[in-house]
Amino acid sequence: RYDIRYLGQWLEHTCRQLGVEIILNKEATAEDILAASKDYDRVVLACGSKASIPPIPRDESVPVVHAWDVFEGTAQLGKNVVVVGGGDVGVEVAMYIGEIGTLTADELRFMMIYKTEPYEKLLQLLNKGVHNVAIVEMGPKFAPDINPGSRWSIIARTKQLGVKMLKETKVIEITKEGVVVENESGRQT
């Protein structure tokens, strides 16, 4: 999922290989579509989407970034990161941030072959990144739209990374002191 930034390139390449004509930066009027309709069976309107920052009261000096900026590596993250929204993208970005600074497969292989650390230490290095991550979801369930066959493993890995998961919790305000949330237990920062 981390390589989602390459999905667009892959889709474009695959479509072109299949002979799909891709027209960019052109307004498709109803007349254009009707006039050309004899040439194809279907029209796909891929209008795209733009991420938005929810209207949460916040101190403007507190940096807020989009999930896609995190995936693309352009977001500057602090030591403590709160992900607002526990849908599919929110959970995956929380897991991605939680993975930053953990051992890679090659590093683990090397360390196991040469027995550089005890097993317990290797587990710790695999499961604790450099960021403290929390994810806040208003609803009762995290990532409800992820395929059930893979959802459990994504949620399990997110928890394994030590991501604090708050469901049925609302973000009230973002301040310099932290993110103020509210749930049945009351307000907390």
Locate predicted features.
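N-terminal Rossmann-like dinucleotide/flavin-binding domain of flavoprotein oxidoreductases
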Residues: 1-40, 144-169
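Rossmann-like dinucleotide/flavin-binding elements
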Residues: 23-35, 46-63, 68-146, 180-189
